Amino acid sequence: MRRLSPLARRRLERFRGNRRGWWSLWLFCALFALTLGGELIANDKPLMVNYQHSLYFPVFKRYTEQQFGGELPFQPDYRSDYVRQLIDKGDGWMLFPPIPFSDDTPNYELTIPAPSPPSATNWLGTDDQARDVLARVIFGARVSILFALALTFISALIGITAGALQGYYGGWVDLLGQRLLEVWSGLPVLYLLIILSGFVEPDFWWLLGIMALFSWLTLVDVVRAEFLRGRNLEYVKAARALGLSDRTVILRHILPNAMNATLSYLPFILTGAISTLTALDFLGFGMPAGSASLGELIAQGKQNLQAPWLGLTAFFALALILTLLVFIGEALRDAFDPRS
């Protein structure tokens, strides 16, 4: 706080004064941290194994069945009765996470056909392949948030650079940039993704690269407007008169003020990225088949109307994430509003 400028401190206080946005930020960070530690919460491997008075940590390191008295040089199925008997013979025990299933682990002990309703074993039920719904929500939310954060960072980097160059130099640079933006923004992104998915199997990085080609367009106009206004201010003219380079003027004197409007847009870019990935997964053009995904879970709910817990769980998880981001974005917008 002491190193912040008076203006930055006022903005921080205004943001903290918005209780809805402030607590939404903390709740979103807590949920994100929860998903990052998903392997410690939902996993078919134990957190800790005590075997012959030695400790093993299968979550962090791969062990073979032979290390626990078995015969095969492969990773054991810790949930099987055979491995449990091996551990018991070694006077040991296993400590499993609260959810003893990973996102791709089927529950072979179901007494009814999948998808099965919520139970003491599967708290939110299973999907149509007997996989734990809560585990898939945790890992699916992590993929969505990481995808959105990466896409937002790339979009901000490209959008701020393009908008700064257009607004600062103006003239033919601005004119050419605007014409290119008009053409580029007119391309149908969804149809392009559908067409390309027929030639290349989509994955995380492939989708990120394609979406990054278009998601930066929304920031360009905001940054461009700030630079068009800022380049004519007196202190910018004075910096030029002193012989400072264009790079120094852009980075030190105009960009910090232009970031005020840009920061308030970032949460909404996050929501757009999460919604887009969910929609693509729902349509079957997103993450590879079998990947944990909120959109894929919603699609399963549509195909299995007799199992409402599938669609409702994914819907509420998605709605919670998007609502928190919208509240954070509104609080940031109010905090950076010069009229407040």
Predicted regions and their residues:
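Gly/Trp-centered helix-boundary motif
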Residues: 1-156, 160, 164-165, 300, ...
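Alpha-helical transmembrane segments of integral membrane proteins
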Residues: 126-340
